[in-house]
Amino acid sequence: MKKIFLIVLLIFSLQPIPATAAVMKSTKSIIELPYLKADEISDISLTPVSIVLTGTTESASSTWISGSLGGLSDGFIASYSSLGAPLWNLRLGSTANEIATSTAIDIDGSIWVAGAGTAIITPTPATTQGKALNPDNVVLDPALPSNTPLNRIKLWQVSSTGNILNTFEFVSENIIHPKKILISGANLIIVGDSYEKSAVTGFYIIATKTGVFSPIIKYGVKSTQINSAISNSDGSIVAVGSSGDLLLNVKPLSKVDAVTFKISSTGVLQQVARATLKSTTRTWSAIDSGLLQGGKVSYSNKTEAAITKFSALNKPVWNVRYLSKSTTLVASGKNSWATFISSGVIKGIPAWKPKVATPVLLELGKKGEVLTSYTLAAPAVAIGANNEIGTAVITDSGASFGLVLIN
C-alpha cells in the first residue's frame, strides 16, 4: 500500500505545474471624471505624451469640460498627460445637438474628430390677410424652433493645444451614426451606420482635409452595421461589424453574422469574410492593427466574448472565446489586449471563477494565451495602446469615467 501511495505521489509530482499561470490583479483609476446625465466617452487616441478622449455630454455643466451645454447634447474632446493631469479640453457644440464619436491624429499633430449633428429649423411666421378677428384677445404662442434628425456628419479639426482649426459638415438624407474616422494620405475616411425607418446599412464616405465630401456609399439593405475599421497603406480599409444581408452574392449563414469587409480606396466592397456559429448572432465590435478583432457571440442562453487574431481576411491565427456579459474591445500594443465583462472561467487563470460578472482586461500572447490579467472597477468603453504610454482603458461606472493605465 505504501508503495502504491509513493507511485501515485510520484505521478502527481511529474504533472506540469502552471508556473506561468496568470493571476488576476486589481486596477485603480488614476483619474475620475464625474458626469450627471447620459454622457459617453466613445473613443481614445494616444500620442507619445498624451491621452485624448472624445465623446458626448448631456450634462448642463461639467467640472472637466469647459463651458455650458449648447443644445441637448454637445460633443467634446479632452487631453490628459500620461500621468492623468488635464492638459486642455474643448466643447464641440452649438445651439443644435451634436455627438462626437471618433478621433484620428494627423501627422502634423492636429486631431480630426468625427461625429454627427442636427440643424435648427426656425418656423416661418404664418401670414394673414387683413386683420384677424380676436374678440377675446387670446395671446397665441409663437412657433418654437425645432431640430432636424441627426442627419449631418460633423467633422472638426482641432490643434494639438485644443483650438478649433476647421469645422465641416455633410448633410445625409438619413439619420447617420459615424463610428470611425481614419486618415489616408490627404483624405479622411469615415465609416458607420445609416438609418432609414427600420433598416440599417453601413456607410463609407471620403472627405478632403479642406472639407470636400465625396458621395456617400452604403453597404447592405436592411441589417448591416460597421462598428470600426483600420486603414491599409494602399488607401484601402478593413472594416468590421455585422450583417444579415446578402453581400457580394454571399448569403448570411445565420440570422446575423460577424463580418469583416475589405473596402478599396474608392469605397468599392472587394471582399467579405463572415464569422458564424449555428443558432447564434455574432458581431465584431472592434479591430486594431495586425487584424486583432473583438466581438461577441450570442446564444439563446449565454453570451461569449470573442477575440481573434488574423493573418489575413478569413485566416485566423488564433481564436479564444470566454463566457461574458458584453462584447469585446481590443487594442494592439507590444501584445494583444482585450477587455470584456467576464462571467465564467478563463483558461490560463486557474483561480478565476467569478461569482458575479466582472469587467476584466487581458494581455494575450502570440498564441492567444493569457500573459497578464486585471479586474476593472467598471466596464470599459474605450481602449488604446502604444509603446510610450502603455495600455489605457476608459471605464464607465454610470456616474463617472475612470482612466486606467497599464505600463
What do the PLM-derived regions correspond to, one by one?
Residues 7-15:
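Bacterial N-terminal signal peptides
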Residues 1-4:
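Positively charged n-region of N-terminal signal peptides that target proteins for export
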